[in-house]
Amino acid sequence: MPNSTTVMEFLLMRFSDVWTLQILHSASFFMLYLVTLMGNILIVTVTTCDSSLHMPMYFFLRNLSILDACYISVTVPTSCVNSLLDSTTISKAGCVAQVFLVVFFVYVELLFLTIMAHDRYVAVCQPLHYPVIVNSRICIQMTLASLLSGLVYAGMHTGSTFQLPFCRSNVIHQFFCDIPSLLKLSCSDTFSNEVMIVVSALGVGGGCFIFIIRSYIHIFSTVLGFPRGADRTKAFSTCIPHILVVSVFLSSCSSVYLRPPAIPAATQDLILSGFYSIMPPLFNPIIYSLRNKQIKVAIKKIMKRIFYSENV
């Protein structure tokens, strides 16, 4: 039987063993992190300060931006610090925290994107019932339900992963802890864990994806029935950013499972993990800022207010 000594720390992979490349990785990741953080903070500020954006759609957009800022903060700053300090170690407790938080934020973000699709569906297809179906009380209830179910979901997967013995190695082929990489280190049978991941991912991810697609089929069939003009343009301007955000999020997550044989597994893991941990939080505020007219107007108003107060 393999030696099943308790692993108290793990070793994460470097992007490079060359010191100058480690510095380059740290600097580039830190810049992307700052841009992402500022973009999401801007969305939160705009949707909070502008009273014209105090609507359910922007309530969920604000929550999504807070979530994105937290999500990228779980992995990227630690990776930057490790590169600067030339360190690859992470404690078992730190690894548990990373796994739990990554699973939690990904799960809740998927639910938020689904709720936002439902919000657009009701606004476009059932406008007369919108104030009743999507009111402030319902918004808060859906948010709390997403967060609480996320805690249960993340706790279930984190607990089932770390109850396994790790004895093959303590080297994780990622720049942060994630469940697929940890399962490869276990010396026990991980079949039940893998089945649970696949079933839950298909159940949650597949269910949300089908709901989002169904919502937008109804939305576009309704919008195309509008006469050409301001109403159709406004409907498209609020829906298209959300479709782009959903596409970036789902494509970045699904790309983790696409592994071309020409690229070594370790390199592939690092590239894909960097992609799905950075791209969705980075692009979400950019997409909403560029494609949503109300957001652009609100940003201009806040900028004018800031510059005016400075000049005074």
Swiss-Prot record:
Record: glycosylation sites: N3
Positions on the Cytoplasmic side per record topology: 45-52, 119-137, 216-235, 291-312
InterPro entries cross-referenced by the UniProt entry: GPCR_Rhodpsn, GPCR_Rhodpsn_7TM, Olfact_rcpt, Olfactory_GPCR
Membrane topology label: Multi-pass membrane protein
GO cellular component terms, semicolon-separated: plasma membrane
Assigned keywords, A-Z: Cell membrane, Disulfide bond, G-protein coupled receptor, Glycoprotein, Membrane, Olfaction, Receptor, Sensory transduction, Transducer, Transmembrane, Transmembrane helix
Protein name: Olfactory receptor 14C36
Gene transcribed to yield this protein: OR14C36
